[in-house]
UniProtKB/Swiss-Prot annotation:
Keywords: Metal-binding, Nickel, Zinc
GO biological process entries: protein maturation; protein modification process
Binding site for Zn(2+): 73, 76, 110, 113
Domain of life: Archaea
Family statement: Belongs to the HypA/HybF family.
Residues annotated to bind Ni(2+): 2
Keyword Metal-binding assigned: yes
Role noted for this protein: Involved in the maturation of [NiFe] hydrogenases. Required for nickel insertion into the metal center of the hydrogenase.
The encoding gene: hypA
Lineage, highest ranks first: Archaea, Methanobacteriati, Methanobacteriota, Thermococci, Thermococcales
Protein name per Swiss-Prot or TrEMBL: Hydrogenase maturation factor HypA
GO molecular function, one term: zinc ion binding
PANTHER family found in the cross-reference section: HYDROGENASE MATURATION FACTOR HYPA
Keyword check for Metal-binding: yes
Amino acid sequence: MHEWALADGIVRTAIEFARQHGKEKVLAMRISLGELQDVNQEILEFAINEIKKGTIAEEAELEFIIEEAEFKCRNCGNEWKLKDVKESFNETIKEDIHFIPEVVHAFLACPNCGSRDFEVTKGRGVYLAAIKVEGDDE
């Protein structure tokens, strides 16, 4: 389960950030989940809560935001969102994209011109979007 590895990295990053800034406590973390990554938020939240026990982040509040997947065609410049085409995916394709997001290029084409030459402009990956530490202004 890669959610546990992600959780470990998130908690370690927040703690390191607090320590680098001379703070004794992490109060909150905002975690961005890319839609294309399709991370199980419930498992990730559970893992973060377990990993932060006994640390300066133990009482930190968690906030999750979902970043919609967006694409831009390199051929015609068209921009579209995953939600616009996702209903055409079967469960196998959804699972393939979950584990290896790069395969999205094998299953998606620009809805405007049909090109498979596009870039993922948003909604990929998982990252710590914000950290609130002791002493931050409200």
